[in-house]
């Protein structure tokens, strides 16, 4: 009979990029939440300790998924032939900060906060998988609403949006005298993540 870890790994594999929610695992594996969390932690440690394994287990918003590990990211990017070496612009960083803290938000609302047109930089974020359109606003023209993606959380090491540093009065205090914004200025660990964003 296969072990519970083997069963979990198989389910994660067939779930693919979409991942699998904790409640689904609870039903399929017939385990309580604490047991699932313990099992997931054991699998995480097993994958991390295996130098011949290029996978890792992530938990995002009570959903588990298998992804490629950071050690093989360059190879994976080369496989998909996606130009991720080009530095992301300061405008895109500002927009990403706004979307992260004000989502769901329309492009017009982003423009109003920044005072300039954001179309090009916003599309760059969509292309890079950090932001996506999700639904429309109940307003004239039904403009698209934008939110951050699971990849955004994954990239910066957050489990959910609740882990983002708290910024009071976002519209008024988060931009400096030059109109720039530091998305993760509140603490050291998050600040490191911001610099990682600049290197995208």
UniProtKB/Swiss-Prot annotation:
It is found in: Cytoplasm. GO terms for cellular component: cytoplasm. Pfam families: SMC_ScpB (PF04079). Participates in chromosomal partition during cell division. May act via the formation of a condensin-like complex containing Smc and ScpA that pull DNA away from mid-cell into both cell halves. Belongs to the ScpB family. NCBIfam families: SMC-Scp complex subunit ScpB. This is Segregation and condensation protein B. It comes from Lactobacillus delbrueckii subsp. bulgaricus (strain ATCC 11842 / DSM 20081 / BCRC 10696 / JCM 1002 / NBRC 13953 / NCIMB 11778 / NCTC 12712 / WDCM 00102 / Lb 14). The gene is scpB.
